């Protein structure tokens, strides 16, 4: 009886192991296609270190990582945009973009559209420059953690007074 359970456990491991090969995320296959297309597997690609991986390893806190990830995702969207006319890799690019949509934007189309809108602004466009400078003070106020804490304390104080009356 003991040997039977070992044999069944072994068979289960083999079945689950073989299923792992077929249950890969779709982006992996498409990323491999892009690597072949761009000869990104060649040894010279590793010269001078990584672009993104070391940066991601340096940041452990979730909010810090999200900031870095947003810049990296922005880079990839710009990169993919430059490939839009190349039909040989279009399927791979679209599959990867869709997977980014699921993983990074939680399938939230509005969030993705706003993100793409931000990454598509041209810093050389005079109207964009003028609007950005016009909004700078408000944007800086939104970035300040002190402003957010002050707002929260005021609203909590107000609620406390109302409850005691």
UniProtKB/Swiss-Prot annotation:
UniProt-listed Pfam families: IFN-gamma (PF00714)
Modified residues (Pyrrolidone carboxylic acid): 24
Cellular component GO terms held in the UniProt record: extracellular space
Record keywords: Antiviral defense, Cytokine, Glycoprotein, Growth regulation, Pyrrolidone carboxylic acid, Secreted, Signal
Record: glycosylation sites: 48, 120
Residues making up the signal peptide according to the UniProt record: 1-23
Gene Ontology BP, a term: cell surface receptor signaling pathway via STAT
Keyword Glycoprotein: yes
InterPro entries: 4_helix_cytokine-like_core (IPR009079), Interferon_gamma (IPR002069)
Keyword Glycoprotein set for record: yes
Tissue note: Released primarily from activated T lymphocytes.
UniProt-recorded Gene Ontology molecular function terms: cytokine activity; type II interferon receptor binding
Predominant cellular place of this UniProt entry's protein: secreted
Localisation per UniProt entry: Secreted
Subunit structure: Homodimer. Interacts with IFNGR1 (via extracellular domain); this interaction promotes IFNGR1 dimerization.
Family in the record: Belongs to the type II (or gamma) interferon family.
Biological role: Type II interferon produced by immune cells such as T-cells and NK cells that plays crucial roles in antimicrobial, antiviral, and antitumor responses by activating effector immune cells and enhancing antigen presentation. Primarily signals through the JAK-STAT pathway after interaction with its receptor IFNGR1 to affect gene regulation. Upon IFNG binding, IFNGR1 intracellular domain opens out to allow association of downstream signaling components JAK2, JAK1 and STAT1, leading to STAT1 activation, nuclear translocation and transcription of IFNG-regulated genes.
Protein name as catalogued: Interferon gamma
Species this protein is from: Cercocebus atys
